[in-house]
Amino acid sequence: MSETINTSAQFPTFEKPTVQFNEKGWGPCELPDTFKDVPYQPFSKNDRLGKICDWTNTSNNDKKYQNKYASSFGTGIQYSYYHEEDETTFHLVDTARVQKPPHQRGRFRNMRNSRSGRGRNARGGINTHGMTTLSGKNVKARDPRRGMGKKFGNRGPPPKMRESSVAVRSDWASIEEMDFPRLIKLSLPNIKEGVDIATCGTLEYYDKTYDRINVKNEKPLQKIDRIVHTVTTTDDPVIRRLSKTVGNVFATDAILATIMCSTRSNYSWDIVIEKVGDKIFMDKRDHTEFDLLTVNETSVEPPTDDDSSCNSPRNLAIEATFINHNFSQQVLKTGDQEAKFKFEESNPFISEDEDIQVASVGYRYKKWELGSDIVLVARCEHDGVLQTPSGEPQFMSIKALNEWDSKMANGVEWRQKLDTQRGAVLANELRNNACKLAKWTVQAVLAGSDQLKLGYVSRINPRDHSRHVILGTQQFKPHEFATQINLSMDNAWGILRCIIDLVMKQRDGKYLIMKDPNKPIIRLYDIPDNTFDSDDSDDGEGDDGEGFQQVYNYANNSNKI
């Protein structure tokens, strides 16, 4: 029997698939019809696959949500499927802590917290009964999409823009810009103590009973009816006389302190400089806020600019100036029967026939050699004198710090801390009024004062800015206090010398240096010679026709404060 093989059987054939060739890139050139209009859910390989797509994300054109086109990785996890374990295999476990021997208790506690970074005292977490939970700050950090509004400046109030002390005019030419980081690096060492050229005025002796004042034994601040002169450089008759024979740079201690402590200032200020030949005269503009004492200038939250409030920067400055002048006169022994210390010359700003009560101020005109044939002549001031047991007088600079509202100033309560923690009160004042305290220290060093007396004056009621009490006093040696507040006199002299050298290189004329109100920069401008001439007044001219700046009677102006 033979078998026959059928060779005509049909075998399955192989059909070659169509492969699309993309000449310009890789991947398919066109999308098949079967895959068109199929929604697609973005995903990450790190996410668990819980669904194919999300039909709830409808498109909208609401501009309120600026981050709707951001990455959507991980947004569908809340809809994911989670496999629940069988609870029949669950068993209770005894979690009671085994009591350790005394020598092993707390053995690795500090090491564990410091290494893991998740302990109670470590950064990044709070340990609560063995459970480590992230703090609120770090919880927000886990989601990179949170806080985008604050990051791009869409939330929060805009930065406060301060006004300039003087409006820059179009005909002023900017010569130089000096930023604070560069000024801080300047240094002019080995400047010797100033030499006295002339001494004027009369000083009263300090009343030591004010050293025993404390919070429980406070004393009301009185309103002293005395006149305080604030005469600028070119209106000083003594400087006019000395400029003919001595020095080539002339200024006052207030002007020098403003320049030397410029790197600590936040508010805007300006000083007019006039160059005549090889001589420079530094002046302040008349009837400005240059002589007012700032309050909380360097604070993290300075006073708000509300002119209707008694706690606005200007009203606080007037109040601080009023307190400072009254305190410096109240702590002195006044009266016709009390002894007084008289300098060689009388007060140069009053005539002999004038019957007015002038504040106790001693003027000391000194000169300094700054090198390169630069001789500085300045008028410095003393506020009082102290009689020592040896009989030698010690000259004093008397200033007052004032408390206006500790809650608004982010400070400490003076009535609670001043007697027990005076260092904390002073440290808080150094943070809030660093520039003002530095100026006072520089003025005391320039004048050669033996003591810097600081008084602590507070409001009787935080809402009443017209009545104050003295809560205590404190004294320092100026050079030691400068070291304590990290004030370098070498740097202060270097800043002054830098500005003098810049002006010396210019032609004769009038210039102005101004602190930028919003940037740590000092600018030098070349201004026309007739600038600010229209602001001068003829009030208070002396007998010789020399126009002095108007004197301020702070006691009579107390109602305006």
Swiss-Prot record:
UniProt region (RNA gate), positions on chain: 289-303
GO process annotations (BP): cap-dependent translational initiation; formation of cytoplasmic translation initiation complex; regulation of translational initiation
A single cellular component GO annotation: eukaryotic 48S preinitiation complex
InterPro entries: eIF3d
Domain of life per record: Eukaryota
Residues with the Phosphothreonine modification: T128
MF terms (GO), sorted A to Z: mRNA cap binding; translation initiation factor activity
Stretch list, region Disordered: 98-165
Keyword Protein biosynthesis among UniProt keywords: yes
Basic residues bias spans: 100-121
Subcellular location: Cytoplasm
Keywords of this entry: Cytoplasm, Initiation factor, Phosphoprotein, Protein biosynthesis, RNA-binding
HAMAP family: eIF3d (MF_03003)
Job of this protein: mRNA cap-binding component of the eukaryotic translation initiation factor 3 (eIF-3) complex, which is involved in protein synthesis of a specialized repertoire of mRNAs and, together with other initiation factors, stimulates binding of mRNA and methionyl-tRNAi to the 40S ribosome. The eIF-3 complex specifically targets and initiates translation of a subset of mRNAs involved in cell proliferation. In the eIF-3 complex, eif3d specifically recognizes and binds the 7-methylguanosine cap of a subset of mRNAs.
Similarity annotation: Belongs to the eIF-3 subunit D family.
Quaternary structure (record): Component of the eukaryotic translation initiation factor 3 (eIF-3) complex. The eIF-3 complex interacts with pix.
Protein name: Eukaryotic translation initiation factor 3 subunit D-1
Lineage: Eukaryota, Metazoa, Ecdysozoa, Arthropoda, Hexapoda
